[in-house]
């Protein structure tokens, strides 16, 4: 039981509170240490996000097509063209003999009696509008088939039974969803039905057993009489046919006639066909340096932003007189005062960090070590990228835009090899642990600049994860997390100790109060004795 200072006149609770404030000083140190570790963990993770952005920018110029972008120009109204990265700059010729078309069959005449048109949503037997005065009930229960052929020429056949209590739309839906690759519909303007392939191209029987591509079979009376669809009226689908000439390779055209679509690729150029030509028409292929230039500049800008931020973190002053605020200290400050304090307390958390210093040095070496290439460029300076002469910018890259554009125009493949070259597979196939120093050196010299930087980034990001973790790791799985857990244990132990110390103070003051009560009682008895 806790006894206040009734006998002694001492404010026991206030006295113990002041004593405990002194005892809690080490606990505040532990709490501040934990907060500092959490801030440092978060700062490392922010750095990893920064490095990931740079890695993404580097990845954007990894593909050959990202640096060797081609474009084609032509005055033709019959096609457009898109060359791939390997197509040589120059003039080519194309003749379009035939475009790919869909097979289709259309009613030979109107299917209604003329005064009133058929409704596709009403039941067939609720209408008396059929051409030639047909009695629709005569066709109830008839079964017909439709056969089409897939891309291999195999037949696909489906059967359909006429139910006059249902609508035309119901029949169309059954046919369209039967997996035949056709679409049937009614055109009210012309009062005709059309059935057509959903894809362009010639889809014929592999064995040549049928000249038609949408074949009607079974009892075709409904198709022939009511819908006016006759097999002989089919317009068969066709494949596209083009002739292509690369005058450097041959004056004889290459004929392509097996494309079922109007996208035809020949000579590394993909043509989108919209019509036929009367003869050969010319297209010119050239390098689009703008797209490649922008990707390189995006990487340079991201690289500069990254090293600027890293150098800022490494040089931030550390204010050791501004430890993290405890909750009690924060309550004593205004919101603005607390913000200013936190700014100084968080400053310099990564000052002179060895991992980040090593990364900056390694990336600079990655960029300036020559690359073994087969092209004309083996150094980044040869394509117009250099380090700023201002030492205060610490490795900031500067670009001679004219020189970079000229390099991309003259030899984009060589620029790609400089940036993205890979080491010989005979070297990279050797397990990392078994490589000699000479082999490691050769791999490095054959690896392009971007590959080197991405390797350095990956290594540092992995080191940061080992130290500061990420959202997928528990605190036991990274260094700072284990340090935080250790501080938590110390805090728990110290809090238990504080409880014991506070209880001891209360016990001591309680005994003092009890002794004072006894002394007061004895004094009162003596005083009463002398009075009497």
From Swiss-Prot:
Signal sequence region: none
Subcellular location: Secreted; Bacterial flagellum
Keywords: Bacterial flagellum, Coiled coil, Secreted
Function: Required for the morphogenesis and for the elongation of the flagellar filament by facilitating polymerization of the flagellin monomers at the tip of growing filament. Forms a capping structure, which prevents flagellin subunits (transported through the central channel of the flagellum) from leaking out without polymerization at the distal end.
SS bond list: none
Entries under InterPro entries matching the protein: FliD (IPR040026), FliD_C (IPR010809), FliD_N (IPR003481)
Protein name, UniProt field: Flagellar hook-associated protein 2
Cellular component, GO annotation: bacterial-type flagellum filament cap; bacterial-type flagellum hook; extracellular region
Subunit: Homopentamer.
Family annotation (Pfam families): FliD_C, FliD_N
Any one biological process term the GO annotation gives: bacterial-type flagellum-dependent cell motility
């Amino acid at each position: 039981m806790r006894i206040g200072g009734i006998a002694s006149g001492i404010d026991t609770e206030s006295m113990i509170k002041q004593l405990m404030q002194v005892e809690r000083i080490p606990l505040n140190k532990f709490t501040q240490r934990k907060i500092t570790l959490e801030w440092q963990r978060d700062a490392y993770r922010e750095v990893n996000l920064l490095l990931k952005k740079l890695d993404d920018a580097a990845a954007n110029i990894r593909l050959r097509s990202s640096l060797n972008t081609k474009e084609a120009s032509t005055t033709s109204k019959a096609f457009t063209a898109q060359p791939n990265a390997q197509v040589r700059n120059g003039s080519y010729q194309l003749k379009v003999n035939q475009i790919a078309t869909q097979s289709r069959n259309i009613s030979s005449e109107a299917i209604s009696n003329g005064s009133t048109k058929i409704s596709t949503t009403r039941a067939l037997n609720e209408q008396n509008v059929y051409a030639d005065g047909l009695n629709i009930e005569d066709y109830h229960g008839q079964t017909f088939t439709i056969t089409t052929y897939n891309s291999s020429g195999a037949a696909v056949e489906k059967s359909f039974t006429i139910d006059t209590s249902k609508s035309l739309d119901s029949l169309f839906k059954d046919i369209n969803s039967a997996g035949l690759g056709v679409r049937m519909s009614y055109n009210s303007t012309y009062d005709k039905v059309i059935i057509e392939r959903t894809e362009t191209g010639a889809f014929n029987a592999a064995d040549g057993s049928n000249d038609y591509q949408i074949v009607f079979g079974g009892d075709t009376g409904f198709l022939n009489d009511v819908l006016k669809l006759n097999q002989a009226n089919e317009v068969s689908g066709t494949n596209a046919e083009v002739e292509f000439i690369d005058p450097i390779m041959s004056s004889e055209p290459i004929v392509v006639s097996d494309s079922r679509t109007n996208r035809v690729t020949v000579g590394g150029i993909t043509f989108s066909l919209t019509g036929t030509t009367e003869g050969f028409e010319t297209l010119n292929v050239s390098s689009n340096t703008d797209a490649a230039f922008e990707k390189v500049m995006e990487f340079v800008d991201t690289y500069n932003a990254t090293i600027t931020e890293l150098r800022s973190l490494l040089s931030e002053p550390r204010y050791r007189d501004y430890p993290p605020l405890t909750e009690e200290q924060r309550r004593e400050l205004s919101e603005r005062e607390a913000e200013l304090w936190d700014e100084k307390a968080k400053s310099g958390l990564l000052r002179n960090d060895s991992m980040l210093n090593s990364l900056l040095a390694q990336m600079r070496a990655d960029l300036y070590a020559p690359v073994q290439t087969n092209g004309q460029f083996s150094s980044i300076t040869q394509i117009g990228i250099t380090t700023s002469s201002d030492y205060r910018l610490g490795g900031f890259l500067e670009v001679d835009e004219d020189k970079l554009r000229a390099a991309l125009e003259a030899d984009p493949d060589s620029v790609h090899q400089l940036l993205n070259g890979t080491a010989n597979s005979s070297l990279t196939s050797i397990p990392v642990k078994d490589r000699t120093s000479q082999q490691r050196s050769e791999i490095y010299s054959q690896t392009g600049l971007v590959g080197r930087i991405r390797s350095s980034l990956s290594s540092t990001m992995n080191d940061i994860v080992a130290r500061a973790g990420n959202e997928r790791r528990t605190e036991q799985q990274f260094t700072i997390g284990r340090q935080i857990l250790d501080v938590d244990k110390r805090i728990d132990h110290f809090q238990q100790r504080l409880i014991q110390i506070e209880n001891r103070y209360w016990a001591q003051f309680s005994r003092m109060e009890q002794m004072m009560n006894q002394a007061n009682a004895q004094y009162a008895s003596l005083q009463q004795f002398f009075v009497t």
